[in-house]
């Protein structure tokens, strides 16, 4: 039986529906460790009309930890918005680290740019204003085997995640990680039907149901679906 939108709160972009527990995690563990420029960017973005697209602070710390454990140096980011996850990545990379960041809307990126500059990490970022698929196709033609990427983070148009995956699994090195954000989509992916969603939300929900099934069966990667934020699926390339 499908769940109703009335049964589960979609107010917060977080799989954790206990507001008290989420507040505890953020205030006890996440905010005290949040870089001052990330805090500033978060506070500005929270006032934006599309603030629900903001990566939560606890997820940001998770991404930072993963990048450091991997000793990642070359990364790709598809979907930037105001740049919270991008700044998180730039802060986690070594001084000579490089990020290829792709988004169709540079004006959102420019909201976060002053915070990136104040953090002293702008030199690590190559921002490309474009649809992602043509850029990825060009990168596939130009990237040599020894220059493959360590890590990719995708938080963009949901219906294209599977298309991005086919490119990224070739651009990221064996042993590298590809992360897909929002793969639990407010928890709605658990149900064959979820009445009451806006049509665009429903398209995304169905895309994630298909993607989750596809990734679970893809022999090229091993996966872990992490219930942080709105769900993050980590794919480690095997071959």
From Swiss-Prot:
Record's keyword terms, sorted: Alkaloid metabolism, Metal-binding, Methyltransferase, S-adenosyl-L-methionine, Transferase
Enzyme class: transferase
Source organism, top-level taxon: Eukaryota
Binding site for S-adenosyl-L-methionine: 55, 77, 79-80, 85, 103, 132, 157
EC number(s) reported in the record: 2.1.1.336
GO molecular function: metal ion binding; O-methyltransferase activity; S-adenosylmethionine-dependent methyltransferase activity
Pathway named in the protein's UniProt entry: Alkaloid biosynthesis
Pfam families, per database record: Methyltransf_3
InterPro entries: Cation-dep_OMT, SAM-dependent_MTases_sf, SAM_O-MeTrfase
Binding site for a divalent metal cation: 155, 181-182
Function per UniProt: 4'-O-methyltransferase converting norbelladine to 4'-O-methylnorbelladine. 4'-O-methylnorbelladine is a precursor to all Amaryllidaceae alkaloids such as galanthamine, lycorine and haemanthamine, and including haemanthamine- and crinamine-type alkaloids, promising anticancer agents.
Name of this protein: Norbelladine 4'-O-methyltransferase 2
Organism name: Narcissus aff. pseudonarcissus MK-2014
Organismal lineage: Eukaryota, Viridiplantae, Streptophyta, Embryophyta, Tracheophyta
